[in-house]
Amino acid sequence: MVLNVGIIGAGEVAQVIHLPTLTLLSHLYQIISICDISLPVAQHCASKFHIPTATADPFAVITDPAVDVVFILTSDEFHAEYTIAALQAGKNVMVEKPLTLSLPAAQRILDAERTSRGRVFVGYMRRYAPSFTGAFMREVASIPKILYARVRDMSGPNAFFVNQSGTFQVRPDPKDIPASAAQERDRLLEGLYREAFPGNDNVTNGMKKYCRFLGSLGSHDLSLMREALGGVVSSVEGVSVNDPFYSAIFTFPSPSSSAAGEKFSVTYESGIDTIPDFDAHLAIYGSNKRVSIQYDSPYVKGLPIKVRVEEVNEYGEKQVREILSSYEDAYTAELTQMYECFVNGRKIKTSVEDAVEDLRLYDAMYRKAGFIN
């Protein structure tokens, strides 16, 4: 069975990642319609990837009876609206992370999913990388007691990687975008900001940037952190907001039965600068073993995701191993798993309920920063 896909949003993540990946997964998916706020961009993608229908009307995609799965690849502020509409139309939904930017908006999505025959799959691709699900989780499981963990993501400008990806992205001409689009975008964003920072009558630009950062780069790291460390953060001990760099210290309960009731600390550090380097990793420390996973830019297909293990061997010597579970990229693995979920009923790991835990963590971070009373 091949699933018919309708795509809403033909920007960077569509052109560089999802359209090529879906095309190569032609035994699982067939793209039958694509929508973008810029009709010429949608038409370009339709021509390049042999998609029958191009439109500027997202609801034409959502209500098309031939569409099995709606991909929502728009900017964050439209995620909730289109996801809910697609669920109301009975569609399965693949929504790129973040699910949305506020807890109330996430609850609206959850309510819509509960009354729909459709299901929602949230696009946290790092959690589907074979080296994460294979070597990393296997090696971490052999650590008797986790003592500390570190989450780091220092990213250079996306354009550096996109321009060398061989995908030749086309960007919209401003004159092709309706004048009302910016007003609608601002309206949706302001509503989400009010929900994300309840009781605060003065949502500053710094608060808005923090919210957008956690929804973009931060959501990758913090979602991965939650799965790797086996649960929900116990507490947020401190945060630093210094745009465009952000950091935090979390406390986690020990996942080990032998250390029940004990806790350990996790540091999170992330930011975006102009250095063309992508340093994203998660490292977990035990008393005699360290395990880390290193991610590279997802915009260049097939860059290896490696696991590094440092330990003391039976001779008392330092031993270092590097493991690569597969060269298969995380997006291919993710969409292969999504097919199993939608067609064969497999449980969705990156579900709406799971994504809500990220938003709850952001809420706790906002409170620690003094942004919510």
Can you say where each PLM-predicted feature lies in the sequence?
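N-terminal Rossmann-like dinucleotide-binding module
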Residues: 1-50
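Short active-site oxyanion
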Residues: 29-33, 68-70, 212
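C-terminal helix-rich "cap/oligomerization" subdomain common to oxidoreductases
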Residues: 69-71, 118, 253-259, 337-373
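A contiguous active-site-proximal alpha/beta segment in oxidoreductase catalytic domains
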Residues: 100-187
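Mid-domain beta-loop-alpha active-site segment that forms a flexible
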Residues: 123-130, 161-233
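Contiguous beta-strand/loop segments that form the cofactor/metal-binding neighborhood of enzyme cores
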Residues: 148, 196-197, 201-299, 325-346, ...
